């Protein structure tokens, strides 16, 4: 009987059925949390977001490919949200440059998966602790790169439009990181450290 040859490695699917399923499920959860408002937790002075948590979960459960895919979809959803109902900062970024706005929304979300995967695989501690640490780092990556990208790309034009110094814009962004980013990171770390997350398996 003639053997059926296996397809060459380069023609194999980029993602397995399991990875595609997890990516779709977590992307759907991200969009649901954003549309319904359940992805925002009211704190004393602001709202913390947990929209990045599905990206972190996907990275830990199924590896960096899934994390990147969910992060891209998270970023695309954020970009579409800026077109529909932008915040004051993102409204300016959108008016200044649609490409800059897309970069600010999407690229930091991709980096979440890269940071989470690197830390989760290398930390020499128990699963719950390294999950919490990786989640905190992933959340801070999202906040710092998002606001940092805004500052680098449109910080100077924003300062000129508002009649303030670039240093004042930088101070404002640092304040947002402290007031929003740190509580969000702590919330993410606590939530994920309490969830049992299994090791990603080779398929």
What does each model-found stretch correspond to?
Residues 1-198, 202:
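Loop-helix junctions at membrane interfaces
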